[in-house]
């Protein structure tokens, strides 16, 4: 906490910190990065489905009252934000903040539409949504006007980053050492991909699913294959809730030309992504099989998940590959190496942005 108050200061530097209407559940037990207290998490309410397996449903009167009370905090919060941010000169954070509040406007518009359709008599909730939307739109406009005036760096610098690693995250590395490790991982993944391509040179390339039906069938079969392999190899205990936790994160079909980096691989073999989604098993375990001790029942107060969750999910991609998950589909190993190359490159982009070597737009070009 002391480091956040003294150095990071999201409440004084980062406009996006005040975007308090959250639309998507975090894939870690505790949200990554600073999250403002009192955030309104829409997926806690049936009007906003938490997963692709859930459907929109009407709010009870108690739920509507609770949601309205949460949304009524938005306008005073954003009014206070203007004063709190007055001394911030972090240009990239201001530019990024504009989009954060544009997205909050879009979310509140969608929420208003759903409430009109399913809770038309909840006038107080509708009024609270309108008030929050107006305040959000006004702050977005103010940020657009102010952003060009903010010209300072947004990264905290290498010295502060190293201190954060060592004394807050308890990772015994410096910024420079993380750069060295990440560059080495990028080179290792790149070389491994070339070896894999040479090994598979006589094999046909993986074909991408060309229709929604084919993509759904591909995802269904890959989940079944993954869970069956875990049982057969005794890698871990397969719990009854694990299949649903994966199915909750199934993606819609994307036609060729609209597939992002991850969809390019996922439309050929979704298994590498399912191995990465270890994240959601962490979440489901905490939610569905709570620890008997109240101290260990929820996310730890020390947010170890900021490093553990993504690191663990990424390493699972390679662990499962080396244990034989793709023995029947050698070309899928190429997807794993490509994904690992991407994650290493993204890591370098993040490190260089914190060091103010790259701005956020340049780092974003790497981030995918």
Residues of each region from the PLM?
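N-terminal maturation segment of proteins
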Residues: 1-368
């Amino acid at each position: 906490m002391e480091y956040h108050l003294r150095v990071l200061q999201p409440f004084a530097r980062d406009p996006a910190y005040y975007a308090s209407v959250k639309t998507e559940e975090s894939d870690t037990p505790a949200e990554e990065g600073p999250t403002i207290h009192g955030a309104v998490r829409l997926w806690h309410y049936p009007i906003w489905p938490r997963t692709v397996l859930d459907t929109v449903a009407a709010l009870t009167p108690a739920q509507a009252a609770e949601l309205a009370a949460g949304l009524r905090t938005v306008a005073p919060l954003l009014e206070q934000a203007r004063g709190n941010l007055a001394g911030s000169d972090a240009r990239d954070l201001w530019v990024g903040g504009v989009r954060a509040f544009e997205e909050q406007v879009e979310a509140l518009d969608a929420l208003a539409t759903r409430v009109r359709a399913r809770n038309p008599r909840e006038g107080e909730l509708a009024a609270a949504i309108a008030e929050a939307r107006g305040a959000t739109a006004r702050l977005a406009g103010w940020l657009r006007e102010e952003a060009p005036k903010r010209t300072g760096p947004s990264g905290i610098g290498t010295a502060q980053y190293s201190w954060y690693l060592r004394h807050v995250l308890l990772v015994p590395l410096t910024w420079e050492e993380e750069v060295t490790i990440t560059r080495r991982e990028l080179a290792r993944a790149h070389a491994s991909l070339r070896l894999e391509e040479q090994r598979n040179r006589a094999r046909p390339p993986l074909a991408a699913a060309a229709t929604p039906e084919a993509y759904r069938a591909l995802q269904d079969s890959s989940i079944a294959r993954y869970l069956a392999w875990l049982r057969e190899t005794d890698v871990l205990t397969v719990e009854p809730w694990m299949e649903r936790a994966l199915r909750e994160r199934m993606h819609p079909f994307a036609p060729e030309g609209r597939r992002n980096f991850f969809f390019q691989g996922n439309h050929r073999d979704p298994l590498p992504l399912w191995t990465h989604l270890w994240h959601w098993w962490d979440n489901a375990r905490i939610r569905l099989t709570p620890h008997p001790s109240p101290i260990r029942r929820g996310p730890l107060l020390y947010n170890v998940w900021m490093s553990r969750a993504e690191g663990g999910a990424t390493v699972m991609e390679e662990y499962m590959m080396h244990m034989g998950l793709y023995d029947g589909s050698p070309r899928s190993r190429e997807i794993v190496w490509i994904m690992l190359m991407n994650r290493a490159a993204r890591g370098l982009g993040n490190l260089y942005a914190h060091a103010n070597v790259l701005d956020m737009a340049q780092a974003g070009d790497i981030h995918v």
